[in-house]
Amino acid sequence: MGPLSGLRIVEMAGIGPAPFCGMLLADLGAEVIRVDRLTAADLGFDIDPRFDFPNRSKRAIAVDLKSPAGVALVKELIASADALIEGFRPGVMERLGLGPEVCQALNPRLVFGRMTGWGQEGPLRGRAGHDINYISLTGTLSAIGPKDGAPVVPLNLIGDFGGGALYLALGLLAALHETKASGKGQVVDAAMVDGVASLMTMHFGYLQAGFWRNARGENAVDGGSPYYSTYLTRDGKYMAVGAVEKRFFGQLLQRLGLANAGLPDQNDRSRWDELRARLAEVFASKTRDEWTRVFEGSDACVSPVLDMEECVDDPHLAARGTFVRRDGAIEPGPAPRFSRTQAEISRSPVEPRADTRGALAAWGLAQARIDELAAAGVIAPG
């Protein structure tokens, strides 16, 4: 059983960070029931439920949230929950009749987790946005990319999942801990702009200390330095180099056969371009896999750049079980690891219309009540 075993969480279905937060908590043992609309929302794309991994380890129900009976059912679930997760724009839960005041009147200990991009307050609170917008406004996107080019758009990991889902999970667990002492719930306002700004804490400090330049691609660990970058190999693939410390940089040069080549000091910014060109020339002489073997066993901080199909077979990740194979799919396993109360994927993602009856029964609703709701069209018949 995971370390969060015994926690009960209602998750209002959505996409991106809110369901990912629910997945993290469910993998750690929390009992999470996902509430989907009876009529699926048009998100502009469809994905086979088997591969909708953020919905794993949860039960799911489909409810008519436009009907008073459907809202009453959700209130019934909330009354016995420890926490709620929702990722709608500000005001949507209130319009459904499920705002914090209503829910905490039913359950004073409820921790009400709200996941948004802009936050519950502020002039942009009601505006649409995505990861790229949240990282652009916080100084993050401006700092990513080469010095002579446009900002490079990263995967939607920084805002959605780093600054969003992880901060919501942290906030929920902190509030749940406080509830043990106070007996009172509270609202957790997890805004991606706040989370992303928080992730930039070190960089803002370095900037004001004069250690970091306010220009992308000109710093030690933003791709500006030749010792923290990627290099093209003979077969058109790449190696990643992170030899920041002098002793690691020394091993890098040794393995490249450049230890006695009279190269510039690694921290001589005026000669970074010269050093980078020399490293690039050598890396281009072998294939990625050949270089991987060259650096095996070293502390040069050099690794192959693997794609999502290659990484699942990496020997180190395979030894740790970082990726798991189940039900015909490959997915990242739960993280982090625990010595006694191991996290686990307790169930594969389910289609809510097929799981509704079982999920409600597992939550504690009587069979007669479930039959009544299904007959009235309040829930999916499955």
Predicted regions, residues:
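Glycine-rich beta-alpha junction loops
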Residues: T39, W118-G119, M192-A197, D235-K237, ...
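Conserved PLP cofactor-binding pocket of PLP-dependent enzymes
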Residues: E296-L317
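Oxidoreductase and adenylate-handling cofactor-binding alpha/beta cores
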Residues: T138, G164-G185, S198-A209, Q251-A259
